[in-house]
Amino acid sequence: MKLFLRHHLFRILTLSRFLSSSGAYIYNLVFIVYAASLPFKNIAVFMANMITILPFLFTFYVGIKADHTRNKAGTIIWVGCVQSLLFLLIASVIHDPNFVTFAFICMVNICSDVLSDYTAGLRMPIIQYNISEDRLYEAYSFTQFVSYLSNLGGQALGVWLLTTSHQNFSFVAIMNAGFFLLSSLILFKNRRELTYLSVTVENESISLLQQVKAIYADMDDIFRQRESKSLLKMILVILVMNTLG
């Protein structure tokens, strides 16, 4: 807490992360409620539960891409603006309760969650560069606490907004967009402080599919060594449990 109060850049990054994470979590529970309100609610709720897990599959790849991103400061800012636009787009189409619209909203939610993981990876090198090594553990711990707080608070706020607006899903999506935009504006105002260690990345001719396969193979090897089970089987179990729960 002392680091948050005394270190201006860490405070800015933390506030931005809190707003961005809250924006990511606000719509999670609300989306399940929206799915349950559709005429095809059984398949809709099933899909809504599935898409909350799918971004996990891209976590390692997104983390690597975040490390390789050269303009981390600028990228964090524009990604937040993109997420804001995505939810404004949701707000404009969510009134139409058909399957095509619902499938489109599912894809937007997946993209937004993946982008949230990406921005989290972009913030980390900035923290590492600007905070002394002996304070990094405190910074990481407080960052995890903020993520946990934004998870609980974001979903609770989403339900409250939905209740007070009499299930106006478009209104909640607009509020969600506002959180992402505010997160980016905070960083834009302090963009000159967002310094980090520059990275040099060699141009690779490996395709996206090949990179994903290589990352998955490495993850599966590590998982088998530690758990003696297949990563794919464990993911399928998690998906089924999440859907049934």
Q: Residue ranges of each PLM-predicted region?
A:
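Substrate-agnostic recognition of the 12-TM MFS/MFS-like secondary transporter fold
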Residues: 12-28, 50-64, 73-83, 104-163, ...
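Small-residue hotspots at the loop-to-helix junctions and early N-terminal turns
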Residues: 40-49, 141
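Short amphipathic helix-loop junctions that connect adjacent transmembrane helices
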Residues: 29-43
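C-terminal ends and interior cores of transmembrane alpha-helices
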Residues: 81-99
